[in-house]
Amino acid sequence: GDRGKNYPKSDELFSEEYCLFLNTKNVTKNGFSFDTKQFITKTKDKLLRKGKLERYDIVLTTRGTVGNVAYYDELIKYKHLRINSGMLILRPKTPNLNQKFIIHVLRNNNYSRVISGSAQPQLPITKLKKILLPLPPLALQNEFADFVTLVDKSQFACEIAIKVWRNSLKFSII
């Protein structure tokens, strides 16, 4: 994200405004979370040079809680988002990448070997660039992504079934 003179100060963050200004609580190990939100004005948004999300960008946390990944797709209702200085935007330049595949690889990467800092862990971009990601042909990436989607749906269905079973068990005990 932009770390320049126009970086938002605490008195320039609002509970409602034009552009959602992401913090580390918004990017979790499971993707985006909007339980807590802070916004900047349109004027402040225009002053910042870097860190504006575009649809289908991937956000990676690089300071504090390192390695959390979120995907900015059409399911995210906010149209204007910016990352803070402890995050990176990954915007693939090549069309032969399946975003779901890349997100899975990023979420399951062990960043510990390239993290520096003991008080506040960080993943400098220079070290991040040295990480090699597996890149099979697009057909295999797509097959893997479809499989992960199927597993996610099955896991969700199982979680619902367990909740229903627990609720019915509670009522049968009463």
What are these regions (language model features)?
Residues 18, 36, 84-86:
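A generic structural signal for short beta-strands and their flanking turns/coil linkers
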Residues 132-174:
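Amphipathic alpha-helical coiled-coil/heptad-repeat segments
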Residues 26-39, 81:
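Short, basic/aromatic beta-hairpin or loop at an interaction surface
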Residues 14, 79-88, 100, 117-139:
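A short glycine-rich beta-alpha junction/loop motif
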Residues 27-28, 65-66, 112:
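Active-site/binding-pocket entry motifs
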Residues 1-30, 44-48:
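Low-complexity, Lys/Gly-biased intrinsically disordered segments
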Residues 23, 43-107, 124:
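A short beta-sheet element
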